[in-house]
Amino acid sequence: MERYEVIKDIGSGNFGVAKLVRDVRTKELFAVKFIERGQKIDENVQREIMNHRSLRHPNIVRFKEVVLTPTHLAIVMEYAAGGELFERICSAGRFSEDEARFFFQQLISGVSYCHSMQICHRDLKLENTLLDGSIAPRLKICDFGYSKSSLLHSQPKSTVGTPAYIAPEVLARKEYDGKVADVWSCGVTLYVMLVGAYPFEDPDEPRNFRKTITRILSVQYMVPDYVRVSMECRHLLSRIFVANPEQRITIPEIKNHPWFLKNLPIEMTDEYQMSVQMNDINTPSQGLEEIMAIIQEARKPGDGSKFSGQIPGLGSMELDDVDTDDIDVEDSGDFVCAL
């Protein structure tokens, strides 16, 4: 890590801590996720690194490299100076339909690319969507800890993700198509941007996890009367929030939906993005063998020293062992800041 100087903490989570660093030579800023060596370097960490490394798209936080310190595995990635999309909604209360569409178009563009690379995210949520520092912010998907590649891993079965964003078929604990489940999570994100609340949580009992699950399974949601949403947008939501995954709208169909296509920036079109990707010859700085060797070494315990700090965006959990009849689990986070 001699190549980087730490500027400040930018948060902490279940994984460890995140810090803002500067490349001593180039003066470039990066975010670094520090994960304690030893038991915490599990298959999720390896999956996150391997999947993230393969993705190169303007709406995905770019992976740079992994570095081993005496105490931690450090994942170096692009720094998104604009913070979380979640924080922006908290400040605004909710977005206008045009602003929501602007960010949704970028979200779908990034997710579509992930799926084209045979990777489903499985934990799409506002806290995992960051913004760069520009005036018209570019959305950046991050956190691939729960992602699965159909090229490297089996079809998803485990119930992972954040309760408010989980698709009905994921709750059923059977094998499901992670790409189709991602569509549902994108719909939840769109709804939250428009309304400033989660679609399937009871506003009077936002922490009643059992009720949230019941509402998800029965697709029980509504757009409040005080929120002005066009019929085209309502139609798109109704096509996303479909319990049967085989009948749910797909990402390619979303990209052809009239509401999505309105005011679509040229850089969001498939043709433009294809040309950008063909011209992106900037290959990852590390080979697979080097990365795997670093991960293997990181599984050996370090000297045990710890960092401190706070990071937003908690709330993901493994739900395989949860009994939905006897649930005492916190929800994904109340919208105390909105409305």
Curated annotation (Swiss-Prot):
Entry comment describing in which tissues the protein is expressed: Expressed in leaf blades, leaf sheaths and roots. Expressed in shoots and roots of young seedlings.
Induction info: By hyperosmotic stress in leaf blades and leaf sheaths, but not in roots. Induced by abscisic acid (ABA).
Pfam families tied to this protein: Pkinase
GO MF, one example: protein serine kinase activity
Comment on protein domains: The C-terminal region is necessary for the kinase activation in response to hyperosmotic stress.
Binding site for ATP: 10-18, 33
Catalytic activity: L-seryl-[protein] + ATP = O-phospho-L-seryl-[protein] + ADP + H(+); L-threonyl-[protein] + ATP = O-phospho-L-threonyl-[protein] + ADP + H(+)
Organism placement in taxonomy: Eukaryota, Viridiplantae, Streptophyta, Embryophyta, Tracheophyta
Primary localization class, coarse: cytoplasm
Maturation and modification: Phosphorylated.
Activity regulation summary: Activated by phosphorylation in response to hyperosmotic stress within 5 minutes.
Protein name as it appears in the record: Serine/threonine-protein kinase SAPK2
Keyword hit for Secreted: no
Subcellular location: Cytoplasm; Nucleus
Entry-linked SUPFAM superfamilies: Protein kinase-like (PK-like) (SSF56112)
GO biological process, any: seedling development
A GO CC term assigned to this protein in UniProt: cytoplasm
Gene behind this protein: SAPK2
Top-level class of the enzyme under EC nomenclature: transferase
UniProt family annotation: Belongs to the protein kinase superfamily. Ser/Thr protein kinase family.
Subunit details: Interacts with BZIP46. Interacts with ABI5 and PP2C30. Interacts with PP2C51.
EC number: 2.7.11.1
Every Protein kinase domain range: 4-260
Top-rank lineage group of the source organism: Eukaryota
